[in-house]
Design a protein with these regions (language model features):
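Ubiquitin-like/PB1-type beta-grasp interaction modules and other compact soluble beta-rich domains
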Residues: 1-79
Length: 81
């Protein structure tokens, strides 16, 4: 499973993406917990519920079951200019 990061999330992770094993996590909610362990600074953003998740280019709920071939993108809030 590929996890893609955008905007300031890349600054937190210091990378554009991660490849992880499907055995854990199985839902977006579990993915958030998994990523909190890898990148503790993300926890406050998850708690504020400001990040959006897309699976295979479609926005999804936290209860979606993930598959090994899924590509998950994590987006911060959009800011205008």
């Amino acid at each position: 499973m590929r996890i893609r990061y955008f905007a300031w999330i890349k600054d937190i992770t210091n990378k554009d993406d991660d490849i992880i094993d499907i055995n854990h996590p199985k839902t977006i909610q579990e993915l958030k917990k998994y990523l909190e362990n890898l990148y503790p600074e993300l926890k406050k953003h998850f708690l504020q519920d400001v990040l959006r998740f897309a699976v295979n280019q479609e926005y999804v709920s936290e209860n979606l079951n993930l598959q090994p071939i899924d590509e998950i993108a994590i987006f911060p809030p959009v800011s205008g200019g």
